[in-house]
Amino acid sequence: MNNEERSCAYIAHIESFLNSWYDLFHNEPQKQLFQAMEYSLLAGGKRLRPILAFEFCRMCGSPWETATPFAAAVEMIHTYSLIHDDLPCMDNDDYRRGRLTNHKVYGEAMAVLAGDALLTDAFSVASTVQLPNPAQFPLAIGVLSECAGSLGMVGGQVLDILSEQRECTEEEILAVQSRKTGALINAACTLGVIAGGGTEEQIAAAGRFAGLLGLAFQIRDDMLDQIGTKEELGKQTGTDSSKNTFVRLYGLKKCEALVDKYTQLAVEQLNIFQDTVFLCDLARKLTARRN
């Protein structure tokens, strides 16, 4: 299959899995909770993290579907983070992916609980994985929890909040972005390799790729906040203008060069894998996108 067909297959598969996971619970008395969870979880999006998990699994020589529980778990954690990021106590956003944010539809309390449930249920989903090497399951759960928690995404959000009232250095911005955005991309790539039965060297290479791609992806995101439109992005633009970003530090022109630099460095980390055409193409498309 060509690159477009592969991408569509990955997205269709994860959409089907996520749709079916909560079908079992619609008759539970707390059905409004599941409605709030599905409102954000099934709202579409790029499904970047599942795609990365599937592709790294495939590049390690295993059926890509093996990574499904890990791919779903990372996407659930990503969705919970978006719900919480949009809350009035965080970014206070009204729109996400072209429609009202979760708390605008279900209220703040239900939005918090929907995020909490998605985070917790992600580990239940991950526990259903069938690994080529079952002894690596503790490693996988450690990767998922570390990337999502205080040393990863949550830690990055904290650093972002603490930096709001002052000017930050490049190193400080790197510390925020490598955790806030890069950590879950790292989880997706690393878990894909583990699901595929990859080597320690491949796990390390996937982590390096993820760190560099995550940085390029976030810089591009910050650029789009300045040059994109609400129609393109599905949310209000200009909301990050007061935040410490590379765009604020260096301006758009230098950031464009940084995106190219980090994307190329990311692609170079894939030499240890075979058949990397799809992933190289994906990396370049992601960092040249308009939404």
Q: Which role does the model predict for each range below?
A:
Residues 1-291:
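All-alpha prenyltransferase/terpene-synthase fold signal
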